[in-house]
Regions:
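Surface-exposed repetitive/solenoidal architectures
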Residues: 1-188
Length: 188
């Protein structure tokens, strides 16, 4: 980026999808992408799917991102699904951004689903539904380091503060990262 990009609340189609994921390098030069809406589909985010990509040095603010396919939708403030050695570095999602979906645990403030992905030096102040402050679902090969989330959760069950779900077969590493939020439990 050479400047902030303001979508003025217009709709945005996610960059990359399952058939043709984003595989390049995106360096935001510490600017912001602001005020966009992504709704619908299987992969909702600024980037829908990234594989072997390098995405770094920018923030998202004022966005509304919602995955709407009932059982398989992923949503993330930066990327919905990341894999194949993707690196997310020095990116953030600011307060005023809402990330949600129809499936619990499949959306996160930064990324909805990760496998073989490194996330380094990120933060999220997003409002999330039943997802994670940083990651919704962390599968094998996920590395999260030097990152934090400070979220507002709007759903029942509530979202969690860093990662909603970690694959129990192992292979996820979390170092020097934490999450805080507005509540720790939900009751009717």
């Amino acid at each position: 980026l050479r400047n902030d990009i303001d979508f003025a609340n217009a709709s945005h189609t996610s960059i990359g999808d399952h058939t043709t994921p984003f595989t390049g390098k995106f360096d935001g030069n510490f600017f912001q992408v602001k005020n966009f809406n992504v709704s619908g589909g299987y992969r909702a985010g600024l980037f829908g799917e990234a594989n072997g990509a390098r995405i770094e040095n920018f923030g998202v603010s004022g966005a509304t991102i919602t995955g709407t396919v009932a059982t398989t939708a992923y949503a993330g403030g930066i990327v919905a699904v990341s894999s194949g050695g993707t690196l997310l570095k020095n990116v953030y999602v600011a307060a005023g951004t809402t990330v949600g979906g129809t499936q619990n645990g499949r959306h996160g403030g930064i990324v909805g689903y990760t496998t073989n992905t490194t996330i380094d030096g990120v933060y999220s102040k997003a409002t999330v539904g039943s997802g994670g402050g940083i990651i919704g679902f962390a599968a094998t090969g996920t590395v999260l380091k030097d990152s934090y989330s400070d979220i507002v959760s709007t759903a029942s069950p509530p979202g969690t503060f860093a990662i909603y779900y970690i694959n129990p077969t192992g292979g996820t590493t979390v170092t020097n990262s934490y999450g805080i939020g507005d509540r720790f439990s939900y009751s009717n």
